[in-house]
Amino acid sequence: LENASDMVVYEMHHRDFSIHPSSKSRYPGKFLALTEPHNIWYLKTLGVNAVQILPSYDYFTVDESQPEKPQYNWGYDPLNYNVPEGSYSTDARTPEVRIREFKQMVQALHDAGIRVILDVVYNHCMNIDGSNFQLTYPDYYYRKTAPGQGASGDIGTTGGDYANASGCGNETASERPLMRRFMLESVRYWVEEYHIDGFRFDLMGIHDIETMNLIRKELDKIDPSITIYGEGWAAGSPAIDYNLCAMKAHTYRMPGIGAFADEMRDALRGPFSDDTQSAYLAGKAGHEESVKFGIVGGIAHNGVDMSKVNYSKAAWAAQPSQHVSYVSCHDDMSLVDRLRTSIPGISD
């Protein structure tokens, strides 16, 4: 890949992609479904050159010991970050199978010229009690808030609640040396052992800028073409200074790291907060500047009136390649369904 801006990324979930009988897969819902020629052919017909796979590490809610039982989750409930999810393997009870089949999947996609981007969720754990982090060093890996003192990043803060910028009951403390080291070693492991081509950071705004920049530098040592981007926001207020957070507004401070552009997304299809409202794609006026901001790639441009851009009143990208353009993802309706609900009388 000569330039990150040349990527056309298809977000997918292992089970969703091949579980339906119409997929005619020998391995429905499994890693190996992405080794089958007809499934790879389908991806190629879409014109994509990269797949962004929803969390593929070992997560909490699916019971791997009952493969015959219909179970489903996106995977944003991390358990063990550095091992593939067993329910996507053909034999979760045999440890090496999930490892081998994940590698077979990556190899097959690479052979077809398709890059593999892994969705990673280092910003929180499924549970605090019983988590590997908490068992190793209680209350070190998680931020807490102190009553009457606002947000606090102090190690071992007592009397406060666990901070919850993830909306899932906790948030990890990426700014602390051992958590930072864990993240650095984890991404390096996925690249060196499984040959992953990039990472999509869930709720990247919870992490600190310094850690994200160190991750970029660490991966550059291996392969500068490895892609890094993420959600430049959080589900709440992180318990560290906002100016330290890897938010979308701070993308220009993170060279080589991109952020999802919700300005252009909602300008094209309508606001995320109301599925019945349409926008530019329906011929609605008032969204032109937001669309133009997306076209120039989130950088400062004399042709864009930032006062009329939704969500952002200042450019946030230093390079257009940091601006991740999209119109739909797993968090909302597909574009087709979104247009159906927001444009009365629209036909297929």
Task: For the regions a language model picked out, list residue spans one by one.
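Basic K/R-rich, polyanion-interacting modules in nucleoproteins and related proteins
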Residues: 1-5
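Extracellular, beta-strand-rich glycan-interacting domains
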Residues: 197
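Active-site-proximal beta-strand elements of phosphoester/diester hydrolases
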Residues: 9-14, 327
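Substrate-binding/active-site clefts of carbohydrate-active enzymes
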Residues: 13-37, 41-194, 204-223, 227
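Conserved alpha/beta catalytic core and glycan-binding cleft of carbohydrate-active enzymes
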Residues: 216-218, 222-348
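A residue-level signal for beta-strand positions that form part of recognition/binding surfaces
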Residues: 6-9, 78, 225, 323-324
